[in-house]
């Protein structure tokens, strides 16, 4: 079964047509049964979403939801938080992260939880941003690198926060960029168990490399990517030895099997390998497996 979702957010104004009152957010969620390729009963297109307190009136709204996980009878969706300045009609920077929570399977009791421990989006892009640990707690990635592949920024940050008993844990924050000592951006991470996780990340402090061309035929660029092993319990990181010239924005799925983490890595437009890392080892070196073949505008995006 798969979850289908959509959120709409439309600015609302008072009767005078000029006084901004907030955004009306409506969520649609459906269950797709792969066995029969039909939507199951319980589909809802009228979930009204309200932000806590005065955040809505202040211009905050959620513009996207993604990467749901299920824990203790609730779905947790990562969220892209936006803020609207009614006086200028333009977007402003935000100062918090949010998660959309709803009961499963009934799709009732929609709520938003928030934290100011980290700032940015929790919905990611294709790579999972949320992982449930052995205790049913949720590790969640927050990245303010937002436009990965854009201009390198010295303030790009990647954090892991924790959701416990349905709320953000105010005592927990893991800072990837802080431990690496350099600005970073990411789209998500993979949990290997017992607090160990692997995260592809963009090295925002390094010169950009060409990764392809845009629809207009112009070169497109990104800072090169790396891979790190995070110990989310002991607050440590190992920057793993991987090839230069990686671009992992599109990477979607890795595999953990028999204590090994598997990922396919190849520099842009070049051949590569399957890399295997021992989950229980802090060595930065992995083992090279099968060779992979790539060409212009070809990217490996997952292992299954």
Question: Model segments located where?
Answer:
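Eukaryotic scaffold repeat domains enriched in small/polar residues
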Residues: 1-16, 70, 130-135, 254-256
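Intrinsically disordered, low-complexity segments enriched in Gly and acidic/Ser/Thr residues
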Residues: 168-270
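Blade-level signature of beta-propeller repeat domains, shared across WD40, Kelch, NHL, RCC1
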Residues: 265-269, 280-304
């Amino acid at each position: 079964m798969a979850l289908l979702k959509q959120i709409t957010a439309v600015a609302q104004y008072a009767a005078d047509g000029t006084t901004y009152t907030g955004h009306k957010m409506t969520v649609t969620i459906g269950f797709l049964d792969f066995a029969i390729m039909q939507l199951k009963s319980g589909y809802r297109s009228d979930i009204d979403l309200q932000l806590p307190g005065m955040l809505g009136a202040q211009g905050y709204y959620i513009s996207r939801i993604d990467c749901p996980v299920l824990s203790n009878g609730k779905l947790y969706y990562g969220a892209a938080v936006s803020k609207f300045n009614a006086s200028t009609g333009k977007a402003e920077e935000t100062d918090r992260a949010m998660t959309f929570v709803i009961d499963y399977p009934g799709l009732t009791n929609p709520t938003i939880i928030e934290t100011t421990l980290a700032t940015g989006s929790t919905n990611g892009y294709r790579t999972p941003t949320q992982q449930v640990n052995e205790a049913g707690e949720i590790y969640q990635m927050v990245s303010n690198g937002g436009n990965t592949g854009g201009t390198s920024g010295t303030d790009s940050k990647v954090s892991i926060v924790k959701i416990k008993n349905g709320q953000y844990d105010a005592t927990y924050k893991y800072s990837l960029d802080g431990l690496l000592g350099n600005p970073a951006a990411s789209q998500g991470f993979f949990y290997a168990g017992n607090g160990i996780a692997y995260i592809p990340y963009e090295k925002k402090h390094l010169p950009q490399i060409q990764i392809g061309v845009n629809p207009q035929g112009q070169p497109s660029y990104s800072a090169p990517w790396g891979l790190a092993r995070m110990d989310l319990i002991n607050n440590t990181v190992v920057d793993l030895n991987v090839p230069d010239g990686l671009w992992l924005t599109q990477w979607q799925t890795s595999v953990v099997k028999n204590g090994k983490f598997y990922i396919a890595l190849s520099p842009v437009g070049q051949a590569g390998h399957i890399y295997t890392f021992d989950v229980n080892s802090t060595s930065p070196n992995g083992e090279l497996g099968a060779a992979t073949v790539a060409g212009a505008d070809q990217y490996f995006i997952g292992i299954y």
